[in-house]
Amino acid sequence: MPTTPTRAPSLLQAFLRSEALGGYVLMIAAVLALIVANSPLAPAYFQLLGTKLGYASEAFTLKESVLHWINDGLMAVFFLLVGLEIKREMLDGQLRGVSRIVLPGVAAAGGMLMPALVYLLVNQGDPAGLRGWAIPAATDIAFALGILALLGSRVPTSLKIFLTALAILDDLGAIAIIAVFYTAELNTSALAAAGGLLAALCVLNRLRVLRLAPYLLVGALLWYFVLKSGVHATLAGVALALAIPLRRQDPRQPGAEHSPLHALEHALHRPVALLIVPVFGFANAGVSFDGMGIDSLTAPIPLGIALGLFLGKQLGVFGFAWLAIRTGLASMPRHASFAQLYGVALLCGIGFTMSLFIGALAFDDAATIDATKIGVLTGSLVSAVLGYALLRVLPPAD
């Protein structure tokens, strides 16, 4: 279609701008959390996160701590957006077609495998710590694109597309990991109800219902029953996203930008990037440094996470991408060099949002969760600083 060449870049540019801006706000939220957690406000901060909110009766109970409302409720909206992005990119975007998906797909696979292996090697003598193997396997797209935005035209657009596609596939892998490895004891009745609601979403899609309201109503019920089932509630957001139609609302208007999926994605981008993810960062990044020494970083769990993010990510992303390009399986992104590709691989070590999220699922005691935060913050910070520094000194894109 004649509109396709202009439509794709505009969608991509809007996405990159939104994610980069969200990355800046997330950075501020994380810094504020660390300041508050190490100030006289710390008791109030942690007490607020532990405050229970909701409703409880014999017939119906929905009462969680503020932290759980953020991690199970608000983050379900984040995962809804992630699911919408994955579906759109695979059906109508940068991940449509085998040739486009090979390089970011291979790099994403390496970028999940190598950090997990590094973590497992460091924690091989600690059976309890092995549960955190997936923590360094994630990449924070908002943080990484925020760093790239600071570099402007010094980084070619092709590498920004590569990083975006890689991070989306990385999110898909993280979703699969959460579903398979971090599911609690199952409530079969709630799971059956969730299955029925999922079937209802499929029926709405097959009947070509293009109004969003029915999907969102069923999706809200789906979230409740998934929460009660023992499967992590955020996966309800992904399931809902896969049911939202990509069909055009008006057949006379070309392009998927007129679809219910795009309308919902557009409506969610700014609230998620500028509110939900920063709130999550503020609630989960706060860790007190009181009494901490060098041993707090060199303990197996934080060391495994930090090395997994910094060392494992660059080895996996760059190593697998280099191998794919050298063997002819994939092509180098346009106007990019191997040095720039390595710089982007360093930025993939910024794990933050998804790493903190998986850390909260992997462990349930406060001391271990604090250890995961130290590892995530250290690995992400070193990756961000060195990745930015390298891309800054390299010659700009052609």
UniProtKB/Swiss-Prot annotation:
Q: What is its main location?
A: membrane
Annotated source species: Bordetella parapertussis (strain 12822 / ATCC BAA-587 / NCTC 13253)
Function per UniProt:
Na(+)/H(+) antiporter that extrudes sodium in exchange for external protons.
What's a BP term from Gene Ontology annotated to this protein? regulation of pH
Q: Lineage of the native species?
A: Bacteria, Pseudomonadati, Pseudomonadota, Betaproteobacteria, Burkholderiales
TM ranges: 21-41, 66-86, 101-121, 132-152, 161-181, 184-204, 216-236, 274-294, 305-325, 343-363, 374-394
Q: Membrane topology for this entry?
A: Multi-pass membrane protein
Q: What is this protein called?
A: Na(+)/H(+) antiporter NhaA
According to UniProt, the reaction catalysed is: Na(+)(in) + 2 H(+)(out) = Na(+)(out) + 2 H(+)(in)
Query: PANTHER family from the entry?
Result: NA(+)_H(+) ANTIPORTER NHAA, SODIUM ION/PROTON ANTIPORTER NHAA-RELATED
One annotated GO molecular function: sodium:proton antiporter activity
InterPro entries to which the protein is assigned, alphabetical = Na/H_antiporter_dom_sf (IPR023171), NhaA (IPR004670)
Coiled-coil stretches noted in the UniProt entry, renumbered to this chain: none
